[in-house]
Amino acid sequence: MAAAIDGSLPVCRQSAALIDGVHTDFLASWYSDRILVLVTQFQKFGTLVSVTRDQPVARPDQAQGGTDSHTFTTKVLMGDDLPIWHVYGQQIFKAINGEDGCKPVLVAIALQNHSPEILKCILGQLESIRQVQTP
């Protein structure tokens, strides 16, 4: 999938869905150095969050079958710096990049409400956008 996306940058994909009864627009744009993700119910950017995956930290039990522990750096660049936007940013990073992706993500998010159910809907929509094959 990454090879298909990297071949002809930038690639933009968009969709819309009803989430909790509210029309929600989605846009994902892949550039050579980062990914831009827009999730809005207000037709504007809202809060802007920068998310990067830090270098993996090897755990002492990794030799016995443990896994790498990834950490993330999230920074609100514009808007309300609420803890929920850091959580949304990290989860959106994972959904749009895939498990092994490391490209920094810039998330613009404007929602009427937030909850675990709304986040699940957003992640599902973004994963389907990521999986769409390019023409």
UniProtKB/Swiss-Prot annotation:
Does this entry carry the keyword Chaperone?
A: yes
State the UniProt keywords alphabetically. Chaperone
Q: Which Pfam families match?
A: PAC3 (PF10178)
Q: What does this protein do?
A: Chaperone protein which promotes assembly of the 20S proteasome. May cooperate with psmg1-psmg2 heterodimers to orchestrate the correct assembly of proteasomes.
Provide the family line: Belongs to the PSMG3 family.
A GO term (biological process) for this protein? Answer: proteasome assembly
Q: Which InterPro entries match?
A: Proteasome_assmbl_chp_3, Psm_Assembly_Chaperone
List the gene name: psmg3
Q: Which organism is it from?
A: Nematostella vectensis
- Is Chaperone among this UniProt entry's keywords? yes
Q: What is this protein called?
A: Proteasome assembly chaperone 3
